[in-house]
């Protein structure tokens, strides 16, 4: 298991493999499963993340009605063209808020690394997908890379 970023970078250079590939190999070894099973699970996680973003951007409210709708309002503001920061950064923020609002409404999210911060990774991926039209394979590599960095945090 990865214990430092230095270790990840060294191994990546030594084996001439991207970090995402090292993480896939580690998952196979640790869990005794096939590559296909690892990729299938991560694809499901990605789909859950992106569905939560879309649901939240459409506007959801918590069961109590105390929270919700902020992601949709932020997206409407972004679309108005009045932001001085531009849309790229705010699209990520809106997606992160959207995920957290789905969580507050008891909807399905991928709690990575925790439910409280579950919007960060989907927010980043959503913003990059919008800006650069990245394909699903690239998004999955991003998730595996983030997972490797998560191992460093967990192991320290």
Segments from the language model and where they lie:
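Generic N-terminal targeting/processing segments that precede catalytic cores or assembly contacts
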Residues: 1-107, 131
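Alpha-helix capping and helix-loop boundary segments enriched in small/acidic/polar residues
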Residues: 83, 112-115, 137
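Conserved phosphate/anionic-ligand binding catalytic regions in large, soluble enzymes, centered on
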Residues: 106-124
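Alpha-helical support elements that line or immediately flank enzyme active sites
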Residues: 122-134
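A structural-propensity feature for long, helix-poor, extended segments
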Residues: 147-156
């Amino acid at each position: 298991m990865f214990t430092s970023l230095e270790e990840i970078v060294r191994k990546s250079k030594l084996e001439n493999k991207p970090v995402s590939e090292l993480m896939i190999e580690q998952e196979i070894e640790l869990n005794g499963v096939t590559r296909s099973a690892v990729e299938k699970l991560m694809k499901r996680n990605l789909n859950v993340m992106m569905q939560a973003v879309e649901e939240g951007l459409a506007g959801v409210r918590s069961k109590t009605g105390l929270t919700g709708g902020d992601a949709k309002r932020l997206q409407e503001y972004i679309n108005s063209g009045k932001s001085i920061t531009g849309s790229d950064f705010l699209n990520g923020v809106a997606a992160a808020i959207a995920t957290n609002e789905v969580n507050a409404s008891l909807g399905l999210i991928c709690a990575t690394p925790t439910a409280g911060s579950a919007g960060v990774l989907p927010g980043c991926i959503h913003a990059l997908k919008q800006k650069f039209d990245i394909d699903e394979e690239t998004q999955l590599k991003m998730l595996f890379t983030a997972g490797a960095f998560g191992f460093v945090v967990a192991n320290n």
